[in-house]
């Protein structure tokens, strides 16, 4: 809204909105008026902070009403998952994955619900005001107060498979409290020990980049970097805008239809310019990688000073600025892990939840395909946009349109509750890159018996094999009512429902060897209920037989009506799953029908196992196997908490260009990628072009790797800061043939220097590109004073004295050590 000269923003101003306002004001009105605005905002803030106050009480912690339903439905889903595991449909890795995914989704939904609940019901809630304004605390902490703590990680970062379902307002039980202590310990350890690592990484980067000072306005390089703009989605365009604003164009952009020049080469890209070039397929820009100055960097290749949105000034220490920009978030985030207290955080999959209680309806006949998800759960895959209607009391209350490639888990006509998960995006169901440790887990037999591989393996469920338990003994006898306490002589334990489970019966007229039998029965605990004497009548019409094998391994059922086929279509030798109801009996274990007679049938206990392609089998078909003997080994990734404490070693590994980790060679390490790229390009290009192109490949790899770590923690670092550090460690080549030069084989030279020298030599220098890690680069500095102040002081100074080296005092460090004016800022002009 615009009322004359008054600009009105009708929205809540949190931290980000204030940042956007100041940025907009600065670019439109300049720095002097922005300074006045900031003064007014400061006075306004302090005035109201003085006259108002916030107090936080237990009544302000409002738990979302949907929490109980969410937790209950998640437990039901996991119960079904464990049953599928018992029936051999999935393996234990699928169980672990689904448990982690389910609790992550519940946690994420509760976090959103907590905020929405406060936003809708109590807008002036102190907790909401403090957190959402960005003044104090984070949503993660609010979630723990009024949502649930969720999965925790121990001091090594491993996920503890026991979720804390309560929050701090409800209070934790004993078990949850002790699990919670693991996380608190992790926070303390990280704060105490890992902060030093973050600080040391900053120091090494500063030593590497301290010579990068803006020395000239232009280096007149012929190199440039191409950025593709076409076929990008909204997220990509937002990312590209951040990448391009503040850069300088290397090539003029012309309107193809009119021939008019839209943007000239050498012009910096601002918001206005970006709107002009957004419809072009590609643009060419200058980056620090393109700069060909021997020392420092030029203004055009660097671009804007992002602090003020103007071209960087001559004499600016952009190298140290870059090192601090990368190092500081690492230090801050390491200390911040203390406050979150070891809560396991991973990206939750994108799920679709019901907006209300009611019944779901959609057309089953069009645009759907029956599929299984990665946990072998039945689902419908939408092949096109699907209309979903939710009814409450037979009245249509909500209509949703699901995009194609969505998995639906609820059938039409089923009752659903508010916030129930009814589907998920297929992209989230694909296997994500998981941060964790690859492990090989041994799977052992839980019972003794014979291995059996069915002829046909299901496409949906992979390979399934069974362990068939072996019969040890069989006996029968009749028991009557229980009349004496804890006596098993002539007693009957009978069922209380039509579905019989966990009962103990024997047949009549057979000798039992009372002592051995009694001893065996003491160990059996599968007793459901004992019947009161007054309520039980003597019953001889039903005879049910239990054959004991290694404590209840084989079950024999006798039917009083003496039907010929008591189990319908089940044949001898077929396998039955846990929970199946057979002639009013619910099977407690997976079983195989091994004998069927006129009066009874015999079942043998079996145990199914599911395997996949990563399984290393240790058994063959039909051998006998003992309890606890190795069945197979399976590879899986044990997920760990991914916070900055795990991220910083990754940044360090990339910037130090490590080849080994824990005495093992790193597969696809930067050195291997660079060498492979160089020799591939060398087939088509000359030495210089091949070296530059292979450096481009590794530079992109390193920048993406570092950005991934910081983006996962929600930290934005401008690409140009990382580019400056990466430029330093990818600027050297190793001489393989000195040609007409005075250099030796194995000497390290700057690529820009070699390019200049080769233009003057008849027999050119032949070389290969190399990566120097931060430490190695600092120790190969031209200044021996800077080298000595970093590490190995005695060795560096002794070697410099023996070689008679001269130090030209061109960098910051050497001038600082000797007390001279540093060649930056006002010292640069002098």
Curated annotation (Swiss-Prot):
One of its GO terms (molecular function) is DNA binding. GO terms for biological process: DNA-templated transcription. This is DNA-directed RNA polymerase subunit beta''. In plastids the minimal PEP RNA polymerase catalytic core is composed of four subunits: alpha, beta, beta', and beta''. When a (nuclear-encoded) sigma factor is associated with the core the holoenzyme is formed, which can initiate transcription. DNA-dependent RNA polymerase catalyzes the transcription of DNA into RNA using the four ribonucleoside triphosphates as substrates. Its EC number is 2.7.7.6. Zn(2+) binds at residues 219, 291, 298, 301.
